[in-house]
């Protein structure tokens, strides 16, 4: 239902694979994922901006995979919460059409409304039922810059603030002729 609501092509066939990697929040050492053959692809969601314009955000893919554990940093120690490990999740990936924190926030808000309307998910960000990971890359020309990923944002405000901060950080670095390092924050 989500794929249809987001104007996606629905795959007639899909498969799940093991995605092997070591990370402390992945106790099995692999994750089950539809990454190679997503259930949905080539969709879009139109969002209404504050100035009244409508912008189309293209959706590359929607696929199912297992959630991982959660790293919790407390008093100089890192703990791992495995309560959500193995729980199925839907991952949605967009094309690089989002150009501002406002557009990202509007996209997430509209997606949340659709998921709730379809009764696919309560999509409560504060409960971890919907999380956002943003990739920010700035460039002085048409070529995409080096991306920095910010993971597990759990509110519209954190999406907005994280993007604004990262745009400012990368702008200052580029203005000072510093290299942007690809990283996850």
Residue ranges and their predicted role:
Residues 1-185:
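Basic, nucleic-acid-interacting segments
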């Amino acid at each position: 239902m989500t794929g249809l609501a987001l104007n996606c092509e629905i795959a007639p066939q899909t498969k799940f694979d093991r995605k092997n990697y070591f990370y402390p929040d992945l106790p099995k050492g692999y994750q089950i994922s539809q990454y190679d053959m997503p259930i949905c692809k080539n969709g879009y969601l139109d969002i209404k901006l504050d100035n009244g314009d409508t912008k189309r955000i293209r959706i590359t893919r929607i696929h199912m995979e297992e959630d991982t554990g959660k790293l919790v940093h407390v008093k100089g120690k890192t703990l791992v919460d495995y309560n959500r490990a193995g729980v199925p999740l839907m991952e949605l990936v967009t094309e690089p059409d989002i150009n501002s924190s406002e557009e990202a926030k509007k996209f997430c808000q509209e997606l949340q409304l659709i998921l709730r309307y379809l009764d696919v998910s309560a999509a409560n960000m504060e409960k971890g039922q919907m999380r956002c990971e943003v990739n920010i890359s700035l460039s002085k020309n048409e070529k995409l810059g080096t991306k920095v990923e910010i993971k597990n944002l759990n509110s519209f405000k954190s999406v907005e603030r994280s993007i604004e901060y990262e745009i400012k950080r990368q702008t200052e670095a580029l203005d000072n002729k510093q290299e942007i390092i690809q990283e996850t924050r």
